[in-house]
Curated annotation (Swiss-Prot):
One of its GO terms (biological process) is DNA-templated transcription initiation. This is Positive control factor. Residues 132-157 bind DNA. NCBIfam families: PRK06930.1, sigma70-ECF. Positive regulatory protein that acts at the late promoter PL. Keywords: Activator, DNA-binding, Transcription, Transcription regulation. It comes from the Bacteria. The keyword Transcription regulation applies. The keyword Transcription applies. The gene is xpf. GO terms for molecular function: DNA binding; sigma factor activity.
């Protein structure tokens, strides 16, 4: 792959050398054939630049948000509800290490408020004790996105708890 990239870059350099005298010359001095050559060489340079950028970056040039990067925001690492359930049961411990059924129901209700994305990040941070940075690396997002999402999830659950407390009072 590197050999191919090297060859393309070398060809691009040679093509630019060929194009330079045609680009510097006044168009009124150039013959019809030289004008055609100038246009063809300019197109060749554009194509070579496109290919070298594609080979270097591994994705189509010019796309601001490539599909492989867009997919990061739709992907979930934890998809099995049983795994999420096992995390939720381990969230709060009573002194003897057992979580009461009432607490489990409260945890389930709190987690039900969250989107899959929020739930995933929240559980990785609070249950698995992953750092924001590690979660960001795992999910392919920025650290600030993880922080904001976890903060939003905590606020949602806190509001629900406050509403439940008000309704009980």
């Amino acid at each position: 792959m590197q050999d191919l990239l090297f060859e393309y870059k070398r060809t691009l350099k040679q093509t630019r050398i060929q194009y330079k005298p045609l680009a510097e010359a006044d168009e009124s001095v150039l013959s019809a054939e030289e004008l055609k050559d100038k246009k063809i060489i300019r197109n060749m340079i554009t194509d070579l630049e496109y290919v070298t950028e594609w080979l270097e970056k591994g994705r189509q040039p010019g796309i601001r948000r490539a599909i492989d990067r867009r997919d990061v925001y739709q992907r979930l690492m934890i998809k099995d509800p049983r795994i999420i359930e096992s995390f939720s049961s381990a969230m709060m411990f009573e002194p003897d290490g057992q979580v009461s059924e009432e607490d489990r129901d409260r945890i389930r209700e709190a987690l039900a408020l969250l989107t899959d994305r929020e739930k995933e990040m929240f559980l990785l941070h609070k249950v698995e004790c992953f750092s924001y940075e590690r979660i960001a690396d795992l999910l392919g997002v920025k650290k600030s996105t993880v922080q904001t999402t976890i903060k939003r999830a905590s606020l949602k659950m806190q509001r629900q708890q406050e509403e439940m407390n008000r309704s009980l009072a």
